[in-house]
């Protein structure tokens, strides 16, 4: 079986400081021989300690494991503040990291039915017309 306590080596390359987006950008190489992939949450913690930042300032994505395992490569962004992270990161990545709530919307079928109901009535009195149509 794989040992989950074995050491993991993190290497960063292509390090760029991006002052316009107030972040540091890098490619991360994770060496984990004889061990399963490291979780994104654990990776965020390790990068935060390496770069003296808070865990909620780090965003990790695009992790790909090489064939045969043992080495994973991905991207990491370390923002100067949690506010900058919330401002510039895509919403889906914030949801994945648990920094934003997922917006629950109606099912596709319900949205289409509502759209078609509203299409049958035109003008400003859509709500009144919908009620009148139901009463008939």
UniProtKB/Swiss-Prot annotation:
Region (Disordered): 105-136
Keyword terms: Cytoplasm, Methyltransferase, Ribonucleoprotein, Ribosomal protein, Transferase
Signal peptide: none
Subcellular location: Cytoplasm
Coiled coil (residue ranges): none
Top-level taxon of origin: Eukaryota
Compositionally biased intervals (Basic residues): 108-120
Main location class: cytoplasm
GO cellular component: cytoplasm; ribonucleoprotein complex; ribosome
GO molecular function: methyltransferase activity; structural constituent of ribosome
Database matches in Pfam families: Ribosomal_S24e
GO BP: methylation; translation
Family membership noted in the UniProt record: Belongs to the eukaryotic ribosomal protein eS24 family.
Assembly and interaction partners: Component of the small ribosomal subunit. Mature ribosomes consist of a small (40S) and a large (60S) subunit.
HAMAP family: Ribosomal_eS24
Protein name: Small ribosomal subunit protein eS24
Species this chain originates from: Chaetomium thermophilum (strain DSM 1495 / CBS 144.50 / IMI 039719) (Thermochaetoides thermophila)
């Amino acid at each position: 079986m794989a040992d989950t306590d074995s050491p993991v080596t993190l290497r960063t390359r292509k390090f760029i400081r991006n002052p316009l987006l107030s972040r540091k950008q890098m490619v991360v190489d994770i060496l984990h021989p004889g061990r399963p992939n490291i979780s994104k949450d654990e990776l965020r913690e390790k990068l935060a300690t390496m770069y003296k930042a808070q865990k909620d300032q780090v965003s990790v994505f695009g992790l790909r494991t090489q064939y045969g395992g043992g080495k994973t490569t991905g991207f990491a962004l370390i923002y100067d503040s949690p506010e900058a992270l919330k401002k510039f990161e895509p919403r889906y990545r914030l949801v994945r990291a648990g920094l934003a709530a997922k917006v629950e919307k109606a099912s596709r079928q319900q949205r289409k039915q509502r759209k078609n109901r509203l299409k049958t009535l035109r003008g400003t009195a859509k709500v009144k017309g919908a009620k009148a149509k139901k009463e008939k």
